[in-house]
């Protein structure tokens, strides 16, 4: 009996998943640049010819992994933003979801710093790249929602421009996280601060940049304490 289209697609998805899992393992161990298609084929137990049936290049594999990673990040951040009723707790959750993301997937964290310009999207743009762009836009929308809630609650400056502030907040939090992990020993020697102390201190500075002056003292009651790293 011939295989149905649904079974063919299910089998193709199974093979793609195996290839992507092998590639993700190798990228984490050896970096993207240090991994070859031959190694992906060996670890996934497929021939290189079979790999190319499902993915045109190593770059396309990375595009799919990046989308998967960004979609998971969106789901974590969306939960953090929508399930916390306290503005301060929401900010803390947002910061430390991004800290956890850096720890879990530093490669994709770095890729998330690259902006995806919707004006550059064309018919030739790979679907995984388009999907990643959509995930980024959903993250930005949630951050803007978080900021608007703060404005509506009378906590955040009312004259805040949402789109620039969203980009600033994302860039500030992710930038501090990168510094904390990549310059950990320098921070310890020069500032006499642990990575956790550095993160807590700078997250508080970022938050203070959002708050109305009369609200700032409330933040001390909800300290942004970093979980064990």
What is each stretch, according to the model?
Residues 28, 52-56, 68:
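Base-recognition residues in the alpha-helical recognition helix of bacterial helix-turn-helix
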Residues 103-142, 163-164:
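Short secondary-structure transition hinges
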Residues 23, 45-55:
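Short hydrophobic/aromatic patch on the recognition helix
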Residues 65-93, 124, 144-152:
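Amphipathic alpha-helical linker/stalk segments
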Residues 1-3, 100, 141, 145-153, ...:
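C-terminal peripheral helix-coil segments that are non-catalytic and often amphipathic
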Residues 79-107, 162-169:
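Hydrophobic alpha-helical connector segments
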Residues 1-30, 35-43, 60:
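Basic, helix-initiating cap at the start of DNA-binding domains
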Residues 33, 47, 56-58, 86, ...:
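Short coil/turn motifs that cap or connect alpha-helices
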